[in-house]
Amino acid sequence: MEKYLNYKGISPFPDDFDNFWNEEINKVDEFFEKELKYEMIKKDFGIPFAECYDLYFNGIGGARIYSKLIIPKGTKDKKIPFILKFHGYQGQSSDWSRNIGIVASGIGLVMMDVRGQAGKSQDNGVFDGITVRGHIIKGVKEGRNKLFYKDVYLDTYLLSKIIENFEFTDKENI
């Protein structure tokens, strides 16, 4: 058992791993500053202490990404912490009502539907073979720039930047 405590697998860790991700993050930062478009559509559920929005934004590669955004009412003069919540594999964001308790405690919540899974987000990637399962290996043959989850991670980062830039967000507590 001792030999497995430091086991690193049989695949070598890419020498340029950090450079690759730093370049990708820099591209997203530039996209955020110059091209990002997002849309918030208010939902009226009659909840006295919360505001609910459908939040759409253009993700990596032009995919339209959907998220549910719930914020406590009366946040104009306050800074609120945020939780970014994600669903399981082949899932979608949970129902609005299942998360209302979080917002009742003064915390904002955003739930992103991962592209290509069961939610409302769009997957505009072109992949050969199976698309219902196997997301983890989508794009492996084509190379790291085509990896499915690379774009998912970058969509997530982009969503975090959107949330971070709301005037009512406590940027230290996301």
Indicate where each model-derived feature is located.
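Short beta-strand element of the alpha/beta-hydrolase
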Residues: 66-71, 77-90, 109
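Cap/lid segment of the alpha/beta-hydrolase catalytic domain
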Residues: 99-154
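Short beta-strand micro-motifs in enzyme catalytic cores
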Residues: 51-55
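Glycine-centered tight beta-turn/hairpin loop motif at sheet-sheet or coil-to-beta transitions
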Residues: 60-62
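Alpha/beta-hydrolase fold nucleophile elbow
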Residues: 167-174
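The serine-hydrolase catalytic nucleophile loop
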Residues: 89-103
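N-terminal targeting or regulatory segments adjacent to alpha/beta-hydrolase or S9 domains
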Residues: 1-50
